[in-house]
From Swiss-Prot:
Belongs to the universal ribosomal protein uS10 family. One of its GO terms (molecular function) is structural constituent of ribosome. Signal peptide: none annotated. The keyword Ribonucleoprotein applies. SMART domains: Ribosomal_S10 (SM01403). InterPro entries: Ribosomal_uS10, Ribosomal_uS10_CS, Ribosomal_uS10_dom, Ribosomal_uS10_dom_sf. Part of the 30S ribosomal subunit. It comes from Shewanella baltica (strain OS155 / ATCC BAA-1091). The keyword Ribonucleoprotein applies. It comes from the Bacteria. This is Small ribosomal subunit protein uS10. Keywords: Ribonucleoprotein, Ribosomal protein. Gene3D superfamilies: Ribosomal protein S10 domain. Involved in the binding of tRNA to the ribosomes.
Amino acid sequence: MQNQRIRIRLKGFDHRLIDQSTAEIVETAKRTGAQVRGPIPLPTRKERYTILISPHVNKDARDQYELRTHKRLVDIVEPTEKTVDALMRLDLAAGVDVQISLG
C-alpha cells in the first residue's frame, strides 16, 4: 500500500455525529501507524424551502425550513494493511454517509 492515499468524505445533517465519526477514523488511523491529514471541514450546503401555511388565501403566511448538509474530508497518507483492516471493521453512526476513494 505504499505511495497510496485513502480519501474519506463524510456527509450528514448533524455536525456532532460527523465530528464524532471523524474523530474515530483519525484515532483509528493514527493508532495503526498511518499519517493523517485532516479533518478538513468542507462548505456546508444549505437548502431552504418556503411553504404556504394557508391552503387558499393569505399569501403572506409562510413557513421557512432549512436543511443543512455538513461535510468533512480526511486524507490518510501511506496507509498500512492494519489501517485498512481497522477502517473496514470500524462501526460508524447511522446518520453519516461515508465515501471512500483510493488515489
